[in-house]
């Protein structure tokens, strides 16, 4: 007979105890070893967060588009500017807004066919007449704060000498590893392949055509050229 207490446990909606998996955080996400690189480990500050450390080292901790905000710190010259993220891809709406900026232009047409011959664009500070008043093209409302706008001001990103040096070290390390990966490594024959080549040579000598037709010693139907290359490599390793 089934124990009543055990039957209630089976019907209970409470989660069962699971074995703790190593390598996971409390949130269930995989634990990432941020100190896997020796250069980053040497310059890591354990008193700072991951975002602060990566910003100080000149790295990006997240490849997605930036969202939210961060506190701006005051400096001697004003408020420090954050470096622009080179991996951020601007949305199509921003690009479309720049392309479709409204402006007045003059068009020169052919008097006979009516085709457009030339498009004359006025300067930004050119005066145009709107409602009987002459105003500047880039400031039709005569806004006194328009000249103080920061559209033409380019904020200089914060220069971090130590961060730039670390980035250069990481780039050199990545370049060296890339060269070693791209380098062609010679293939070494295994012991079983050497024994197989030895049996072929003992039976057929230099007759590569007979080796290719031998169904017992060559069940995978290797071609004459492939067998010749394997035997040449075997002889070079023995010499």
UniProtKB/Swiss-Prot annotation:
Principal location: nucleus
Compositional bias ranges of the Basic residues kind: 229-239
Superkingdom, natural source: Eukaryota
InterPro entries hit by this protein: Ribosome_biogenesis_Nop16
Alphabetical GO biological process terms: ribosomal large subunit biogenesis; rRNA processing
Subunit structure, interactors included: Component of the pre-66S ribosomal particle.
General function of this protein: Involved in the biogenesis of the 60S ribosomal subunit.
Protein name: Nucleolar protein 16
Protein's gene: nop16
């Amino acid at each position: 007979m089934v124990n009543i207490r055990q039957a209630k446990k089976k019907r209970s909606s409470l989660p069962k105890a699971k074995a703790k998996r190593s390598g996971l955080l409390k949130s269930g996400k995989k634990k990432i070893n941020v100190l896997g690189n020796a250069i980053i480990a040497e310059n890591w500050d354990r008193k700072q967060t991951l975002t602060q450390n990566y910003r100080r080292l000149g790295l990006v901790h997240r490849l997605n588009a930036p969202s939210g905000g961060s506190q701006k710190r005051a400096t001697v010259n004003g408020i420090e500017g954050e470096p622009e993220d080179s991996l951020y891809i601007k949305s199509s709406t921003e690009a479309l807004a720049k392309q479709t900026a409204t402006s007045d232009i003059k068009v020169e047409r052919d008097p006979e066919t009516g085709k457009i011959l030339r498009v004359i664009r006025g300067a930004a500070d050119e005066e145009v007449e709107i409602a009987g008043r002459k105003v500047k093209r880039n400031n039709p409302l005569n806004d006194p704060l328009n000249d103080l706008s920061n559209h033409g001001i380019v904020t200089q990103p914060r220069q971090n000498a130590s961060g730039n040096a670390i980035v250069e070290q990481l780039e050199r390390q990545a370049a060296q590893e890339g060269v070693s990966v791209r380098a062609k490594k010679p293939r070494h024959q295994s012991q079983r392949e050497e024994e197989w080549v030895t049996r072929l040579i003992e039976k057929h000598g230099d007759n590569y055509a007979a080796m290719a037709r031998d169904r017992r010693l060559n069940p995978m139907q290797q071609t004459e050229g492939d067998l010749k290359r394997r035997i040449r490599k075997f002889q070079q390793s023995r010499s």
